[in-house]
UniProtKB/Swiss-Prot annotation:
Involved in larval skeletal patterning. It holds the Pfam family Homeodomain. CDD domains: homeodomain. Residues 303-315 have a biased composition (Low complexity). It comes from the Eukaryota. The gene is OTP. Keywords: Developmental protein, DNA-binding, Homeobox, Nucleus, Transcription, Transcription regulation. GO terms for cellular component: nucleus. This is Homeobox protein orthopedia.
Amino acid sequence: MERTLAHVPSMELSTEALLVTGGLDNTNKMISSSAVRNDDGTMISQHSDKVSYGTSGAPDGSTPPYPAGGVGEGNGIVGGGGGGGGGGGGGMVGDGTGHSVGSSGSGNDDDKPAKQKRHRTRFTPAQLNELERNFAKTHYPDIFMREEIAMRVGLTESRVQVWFQNRRAKWKKRKKTTNVFRTPGALLPSHGLAQFPSPMNDSFCNFHGQDTRGWPAMSGMTTHMAPHMTTHMPSHQMPLMGGGPGSALALPPSLPRQGLGQSMQQQSVNCSMGQTTGLNTLSMGTNGSMGSMTSMYQPSLGGMTTGSMSSGLSSPSPPNLPVTDSSTDLSCSVSDAGDMWRGTSIASLRRKLEHAASLNGIFR
């Protein structure tokens, strides 16, 4: 071994380098191989470019061999050539110029194809006008129509197809939002408030304050009733028999006992005032007339005497009962739009008013 090292003095440097990087086993193998080459003499140049492999990580040789050093090009010494080679298992191969070429984990990203960048198609006004004109004709053009449009506007068929898809989505979205606010019936009832009559409507009450046709009949009726009422009524309960609208309006509506003439006059005036009072006056009249009218007409007409008549006439009467006469129609008609709370009271009031009309015929 000493003789071999003496013949090859340049191997000392490479041996020291391999002791540091590759390990003792690897160094011994390389030294023996170099000694054989030096004894032969003629094989030095032939075997100078071979790579010696070592098993520095596993002495039993179970792992695959890795290059222990670099390959020196042109000097015949393994690991030489100006800094070629790394340690055992380093995977670096020296090229003799001081540069090492890596062979692991390099250049994988360059193999992937570059992702194609999508660009946005910009339509000219002429192209948009042509596309909109065809969209007005049909929303779903076939392949032949799309190709024809693409030739006219200078686009590809796929671009035309995508434009029609986007345009259909936009049209459906706009249609969905406009259908909600197009008609008020979608949010409000279609009839609105037309079925409820306004308080100032003329059809709400047929008898007006300016119509004085019913006053002569009322005044005549009260004059016939006056003698019967004076015999059995106190002086503080005597009604004012003026027979006009002014006297009827001057009476307080909250007297506990009133005559039939006064109550009828107040009822007719209240009917004429229905334009200003509205639904509240009518509801008060219909609700108050249910219980008070039952005690007024309890006695029968056949056996009615002057005393019973006066007691019946002096009983409390509803303040807002509308009166009907055979000569003048004073009924307050309400539009029958489905108001169930008025239907029952109107039928009962109609029967009571017929009873009042029969009493009017008796006094005449």
